[in-house]
Amino acid sequence: MAEPIQVAEEKMKKAIETLKEEFATIRAGRANPHILDKVMVDYYGVPTPIPQVASITVPEARMIVIQPWEARMLKEIEKAIQKSDLGVNPTNDGKVIRLIFPELTEERRKELVKQVKKMAEDAKVAIRNIRREALDEYKKMKKNNEITEDDLKDAEEDVQKLHDKYIEQIEKLLSAKEKEIMEV
């Protein structure tokens, strides 16, 4: 059986990965091809992410160009983007689809910062819950005489250090994302 601290670290890593994925979906006035990862198109009856049916390039800071591998997918991709909540209108020239991202207004930037702060807070709550689970597991082991009082104290310190390390990572990610959003 894995040590509670190892289980906790795995879960904390997953929480950080989830936060990074969520942050990637927030566009900060720059074209980010990852915003298309969750936009699905109908590909021969199967919902498929756009990156799996087209090549995606970012020729300019605020433009994404989508070139489908099959011409018939142009209309499908265009429809999927219009239905999505990306907030951009696709332009279809018959060969490629261009997405032009407008400059973000100050108000929109502040909304996005609020959104990323909430995401970061949710990640911190997850980390704290994981810490609590690990500590409870160690207390149970102590109660069952599987570990000594000293072992319990050491484990509590180690779990706290792990918690602090991941909370700090969240703070760094949040700070970088806020800076990216507020950059004009």
UniProtKB/Swiss-Prot annotation:
Q: What does this protein do?
A: Responsible for the release of ribosomes from messenger RNA at the termination of protein biosynthesis. May increase the efficiency of translation by recycling ribosomes from one round of translation to another.
Q: Quick check: keyword Protein biosynthesis in the entry? A: yes
Q: Which UniProt keywords apply?
A: Cytoplasm, Protein biosynthesis
Q: Which PANTHER family match?
A: MITOCHONDRIAL RIBOSOME RECYCLING FACTOR PSEUDO 1 (PTHR20982:SF3), RIBOSOME RECYCLING FACTOR (PTHR20982)
Q: Which GO terms describe its molecular function?
A: ribosomal large subunit binding
Family annotation (NCBIfam families) = frr
Native source organism of the sequence: Caldicellulosiruptor bescii (strain ATCC BAA-1888 / DSM 6725 / KCTC 15123 / Z-1320) (Anaerocellum thermophilum)
Q: What cellular-component terms does GO give this entry?
A: cytoplasm
* Origin organism lineage: Bacteria, Bacillati, Bacillota, Bacillota incertae sedis, Caldicellulosiruptorales
As for subcellular location, the record says:
Cytoplasm
Name of the gene encoding the protein in the UniProt record: frr
Task: State if Cytoplasm is listed as a keyword.
Answer: yes
Q: What is this protein called?
A: Ribosome-recycling factor
Cysteine pairings via disulfide bonds: none
* BP-aspect Gene Ontology terms: translational termination
Against Pfam families, the record matches this protein to: RRF (PF01765)
